[in-house]
From Swiss-Prot:
It catalyses: RNA(n) + a ribonucleoside 5'-triphosphate = RNA(n+1) + diphosphate. GO terms for cellular component: DNA-directed RNA polymerase complex. Keywords: DNA-directed RNA polymerase, Nucleotidyltransferase, Transcription, Transferase. This is DNA-directed RNA polymerase subunit omega. GO terms for biological process: DNA-templated transcription. Its EC number is 2.7.7.6. One of its GO terms (molecular function) is DNA-directed RNA polymerase activity. Belongs to the RNA polymerase subunit omega family. Promotes RNA polymerase assembly. Latches the N- and C-terminal regions of the beta' subunit thereby facilitating its interaction with the beta and alpha subunits. NCBIfam families: rpoZ. The RNAP catalytic core consists of 2 alpha, 1 beta, 1 beta' and 1 omega subunit. When a sigma factor is associated with the core the holoenzyme is formed, which can initiate transcription.
Length: 70
């Protein structure tokens, strides 16, 4: 089961694609230890789970270039 739940994630970001790409990018950063942890405590031990928790908590948001906004 996905933790945090998908409906909690889509409440913050309305696109599953943006959730996936943002989480993947952040997970790579966490895995490479470039960034420090944004939450005091994580439920997940894996970088992707940690990234999803950060998205659900509103600590990170996707960045969409202006040319893609229409």
């Amino acid at each position: 089961m996905l933790n945090p739940p998908l409906n909690q994630l889509t409440a913050k970001v309305n696109s599953k694609y943006l959730i996936a790409t943002t989480a993947a990018k952040r997970a790579r950063e966490l895995d490479e230890r470039r960034e420090t942890a944004l939450l005091d405590q994580y439920q997940s031990a894996k970088p992707v789970g940690k990234a999803l928790e950060e998205i659900a908590d509103g600590k990170i948001e996707p960045v969409v270039p202006k040319e893609y906004l229409g």
